[in-house]
Amino acid sequence: MKKAGIIMIIGSLLLLSLFKFPLWNIMLGAPQYPDPLGMNIHIDGIKGVSEFDLTNIDGLNHYIGMKVIPKPADMWEFSVFPKVIGGMAALGVLIGLLGFLEKVSYKWFIGWFILMTVLGVLGMYDFNQWLTAYGSDLDPHAIIKVVNPDGTPMSYKPPLLGYQKMLNFDVTSLPHTGGYLMFVGMSLTIVAFFVGKKETKHI
């Protein structure tokens, strides 16, 4: 299973791209902002797309009662996620190496993929919970208050994935480079599984 082991190792190593590239991106465009405001979500913190984007977003949020964008120290996820990604990358490389040496079955490759998928789903759920709290837990004394037709306060929760019109802002939430590379890496581990299965049949 040499070929399958190598593919598994490459796929696992692509997770390390998350230490350099953002996982996710949220952009806010409006007529008064010719250059959209944006924030890149990394596994260890949130950064502005441009130098002053986070400051400007926090300024807008203040008027409608939203909290400031959290610092890494404010969220436990930003200290745990790097450890999870590093651990899963190391585990994947180890499984790939053992597969290369024919010490483990190709089924370990799909086992790693399933575990990574579960962790990914949990991560997206946690991210969505944060977006909900971020957009809904508003200061009752905010300068600007917007309500729904039924009289309840309007939520400013950004979409988890895709586009949403929010007041006069066009909000887009999509994976960034690190997210796409992680997807490619996970896809390669599925390829490794089928290649390993094929190689085993030829023995």
Predicted regions: what they are:
Residues 1-15, 103-116, 195:
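Alpha-helical transmembrane segments and their helix-start/interface "positive-inside/aromatic belt" motifs
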Residues 3, 74-80, 101-108, 167-177:
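Membrane-interfacial loop-to-transmembrane-helix junctions in polytopic alpha-helical membrane proteins
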Residues 9-11, 18, 77-98, 110-121, ...:
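Hydrophobic alpha-helical transmembrane segments
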Residues 19-26, 93, 97-100, 124-134, ...:
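Transmembrane helix-loop junctions and nearby membrane-interface residues
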Residues 20-79, 128-173:
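Long, glycine/tryptophan/cysteine-rich extracytoplasmic
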Residues 100, 104-141, 162-164:
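Mature, soluble, non-transmembrane domains
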Residues 172-199:
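A hydrophobic membrane-anchoring alpha-helix module
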